[in-house]
Swiss-Prot record:
It comes from Geobacillus sp. (strain WCH70). Belongs to the UPF0342 family. Pfam families: Com_YlbF (PF06133). This is UPF0342 protein GWCH70_0629.
Amino acid sequence: MSNQLYVLAEQLEQAIRTSSDFQQLKQAYEAVRRDETAYRLFTNFRNLQMRLHEKQMTGAEILPEEIEQAQKAMALTQQNEKLAQLMTLEQRMSMVLSDIQQITMKPLEELYRSFAE
């Protein structure tokens, strides 16, 4: 039975890879990669985002200057048409994956709910 779940998971992976949402996201990443300015903004923003996330996860204080820096980086990122498109497509793909996760977790949620009743 569990082997069947892995087979289905691999099929889901392939379905995600071939979906129009993923293909559009992939094309948007490639467009950013080819644009030196957009790519530089993108990598700077991602690096800053990762540093702040790491601080948050370790409980380190995030300074007001860092928050301001992140807000400025976000504003610059959103002003770039390619990056704005990329972020929109990332958000759409993230929502699809979140919906899929909710669907796959439904049996456990129902089990836990029935146990609590």
